[in-house]
């Protein structure tokens, strides 16, 4: 992680940060002490976050980035919901806009230290494939697109190898 900037809060606790627009949408982490908020930043966004230190990152308002708000909601849900409820919310996020950073985040979402989707489970892999297809189509040179494409390709290759081994055993 490369620090983007640091700042001093004014008497009201307000601050502002600016950075050059990224070539591709990307994640930025806003840290305050040991608390952090994950922001999905596109090249044209101005994001306004309203919260208190005690409630960061779970109780807040985010304007200017729907993906950031969705990610915050997914993170809050991961703390309180059942695994199935979290999977349903993550799936909805992916299906509604597989090209968004929120969808990318949703395929790597964890609960209790474990990923909620298994790349090697064909049913779960559909979520990864939806996101990788969108990212690879719209942003083929983006490092996140390339990395996800490689992961999904590797899982598909492993599945084909297993199927070939099973077929060979059945012939013998």
At which residue positions do the language-model features occur?
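Amphipathic alpha-helical repeat scaffolds of TPR domains
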Residues: 98-115
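Residues at alpha-helix boundaries and the short loops/turns that link adjacent helices
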Residues: 96, 100-101, 138, 142
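Generic detector of short, well-ordered, non-transmembrane alpha-helical segments enriched
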Residues: 9, 102-103, 131
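A non-transmembrane, solvent-exposed segment enriched in polar/low-complexity residues
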Residues: 1-97
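Amphipathic alpha-helices of TPR/Sel1-like and other helical repeat/solenoid scaffolds
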Residues: 83-94, 126-138
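N-proximal helix/coil linker or "cap" segments that precede and/or mark the start of modular domains
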Residues: 127-172
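Short coil/turn connectors between adjacent alpha-helices in alpha-solenoid helical repeat scaffolds
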Residues: 115-126
């Amino acid at each position: 992680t490369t620090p983007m900037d640091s700042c001093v809060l004014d008497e009201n606790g307000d601050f502002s940060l600016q950075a050059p627009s990224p070539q591709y949408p990307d994640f930025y982490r806003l840290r305050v002490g040991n608390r952090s908020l994950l922001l999905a930043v596109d090249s044209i966004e101005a994001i306004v976050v309203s919260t208190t230190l005690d409630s960061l990152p779970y109780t807040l308002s985010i304007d200017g980035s729907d993906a950031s708000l969705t990610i915050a909601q997914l993170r809050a849900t991961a703390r309180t919901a059942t695994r199935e409820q979290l999977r349903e919310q993550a799936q909805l996020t992916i299906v509604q806009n597989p090209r968004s950073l929120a969808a990318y985040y949703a395929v790597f979402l964890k609960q209790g230290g474990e990923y909620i989707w298994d790349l090697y489970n064909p049913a779960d892999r559909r979520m990864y494939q939806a996101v990788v297809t969108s990212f690879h189509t719209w942003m083929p040179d983006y490092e996140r697109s390339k990395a996800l494409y490689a992961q999904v390709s590797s899982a598909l290759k492993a599945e084909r190898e297993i199927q070939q081994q099973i077929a060979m055993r059945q012939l013998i």
